[in-house]
């Protein structure tokens, strides 16, 4: 019989290939993962930190981006790396390479006095690796402690932060001058859980995305006492908060951005500080603000309640409204703060959804849940809320609020079941300057117009609940007590 040798050879080759393949699988070749399990290895491992610019930090005021981006570096390049107890006095560390630290501390107790640290580079990367991990900072501590006193730190490089604390690193900086020039170059900076203490610093930043007091993904702790902190760039607030930050007796100035920006589950406390901002009117924003608490959805901060506390001192706004909260849960507490608003101030407080072009939540569903408490406070301007938000506004301890309360549904889509509750204690008053709308009014104090005339209160059907003499009317769903 005549054999078909081509067919026999093909069959033999197929059997061999099947045997080799089975052997490889038996040795542990992972192949494709089973359904419901992520692939392993470099190709399937997500970056440790997703991309996304910090709110209020990106150039031209771009507050927040999308996920994607860089992971933690395997190592850092530095002019001097220290990993044991060391004292450096009167030294000069000059870094000129791309993405290099002048001083890197990984362990030990390192003390730097009367020294100069500089970073000058035209080809540094900046961006996420600088913001999240301190790549290219003049001084970076990732472990141990770094103490800097009576020194000068100057950077002129993208990503050239002054002093950066990351991870378990702790930095203490006192009586020192920090001057940064290029973008993504905060003055003092924490991320990834770092800790930084600052006392009597003079800090100035000139680049975009370069808050004088800056934090980023992974947060941390900052305690600042005294000093002057000035940021000049666009998208560079004086203070950018994705950490827990406490500041006292400091001058905080932003000349080209909002004064302070807080995102997500973080907190800032200001005591006897002078805070000022001058944010530009930008087409990508649906309003302009001085202090913002929000959630950008960039992944830079854990979702949760942001807390802003300010006692004593002053707040100055050179453009736009004062306090804005959107797409988040937030809590504001003001006590005896001297507030100066711009001539074109749009509002004292805005608690609404947004139509921001960068996508802060889903339009029509991105309101805010806000508790705002004022004590011993003068408040002037409009309070704005919408039905996809919940605002609980309390006037306490002799607070005087002069303005209107308005329901603005322009960013509320199809609306919701939210509302505004206004509570006025027996020592406080509301001086009404226009027709107002409040969901629930609890008043043990005074409600009058600028001429001292009582204001009529009606329900949503127009029924008079409390007759007044003023031309203005307050519309409520619920009146818990009668205004005096």
What function would you assign to each model-found segment?
Residues 85-90, 109-115, 146-150, 170-176, ...:
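All-beta strand scaffolds that present successive hydrophobic residues in beta-strands
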Residues 64-125, 471-483:
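N-terminal segments that cap or nucleate solenoid repeat domains
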Residues 1-42, 50-51, 103, 163, ...:
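Gram-positive cell-envelope targeting signals
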């Amino acid at each position: 019989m005549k054999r078909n040798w081509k067919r026999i050879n093909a069959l033999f080759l197929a059997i061999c290939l099947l045997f080799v393949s089975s052997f490889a699988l038996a040795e542990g070749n992972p192949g494709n993962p089973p359904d419901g399990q992520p692939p392993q290895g470099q190709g399937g491992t997500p970056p440790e930190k997703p991309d996304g610019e910090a709110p209020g930090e990106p150039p031209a005021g771009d507050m927040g981006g999308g996920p994607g981006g860089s992971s933690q570096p395997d190592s850092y390049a530095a002019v001097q790396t220290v990993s044991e107890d060391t004292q450096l006095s009167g030294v000069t560390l000059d870094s000129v390479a791309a993405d290099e630290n002048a001083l890197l501390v990984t362990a030990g107790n390192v003390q730097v006095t009367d020294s100069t640290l500089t970073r000058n580079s035209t080809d540094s990367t900046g961006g996420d690796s600088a913001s999240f991990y301190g790549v290219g900072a003049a001084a970076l501590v990732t472990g141990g402690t770094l103490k800097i006193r009576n020194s000068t730190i100057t950077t002129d490089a993208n990503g050239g932060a002054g002093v950066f604390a990351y991870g378990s690193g702790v930095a203490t900086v006192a009586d020192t001058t920090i001057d940064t020039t290029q973008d993504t170059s905060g003055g003092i900076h924490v991320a990834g859980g770092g800790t930084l203490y600052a006392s009597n610093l003079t800090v100035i930043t000139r680049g975009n995305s370069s808050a004088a007091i800056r934090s980023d993904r992974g947060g941390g702790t900052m305690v600042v006492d005294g000093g002057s902190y000035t940021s000049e760039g666009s998208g560079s607030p004086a203070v950018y908060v994705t950490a827990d930050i406490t500041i006292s007796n400091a001058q905080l100035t932003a000349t080209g951005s909002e004064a302070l920006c807080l995102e997500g589950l973080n907190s800032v406390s200001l005591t006897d500080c002078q805070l000022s901002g001058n944010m530009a009117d930008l087409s990508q924003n649906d309003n302009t603000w001085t202090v913002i608490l929000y959630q950008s959805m960039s992944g830079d901060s854990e979702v949760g309640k942001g807390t802003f506390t300010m006692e004593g001192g002053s707040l100055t706004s050179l453009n736009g409204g004062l306090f804005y909260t959107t797409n988040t849960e937030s809590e504001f507490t003001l006590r005896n703060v001297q507030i100066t608003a711009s001539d074109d101030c749009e509002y004292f407080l805005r608690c609404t959804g947004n139509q921001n072009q960068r996508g802060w939540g889903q339009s029509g569903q991105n309101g805010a849940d806000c508790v705002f408490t004022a004590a011993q406070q003068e408040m002037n301007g409009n309070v704005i809320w919408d039905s996809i938000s919940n605002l609980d506004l309390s006037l306490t301890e002799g607070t005087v609020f002069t303005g209107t309360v308005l329901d603005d549904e322009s960013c509320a889509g199809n609306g919701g079941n939210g509302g505004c509750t206004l509570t006025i204690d027996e020592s406080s008053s509301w001086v009404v300057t226009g027709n107002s709308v409040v969901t629930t009014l609890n008043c043990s104090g005074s409600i009058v117009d600028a001429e001292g005339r009582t204001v009529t209160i009606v329900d949503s059907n127009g029924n008079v609940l409390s007759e007044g003499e003023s031309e203005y009317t307050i519309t409520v769903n619920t009146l818990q007590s009668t205004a005096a």
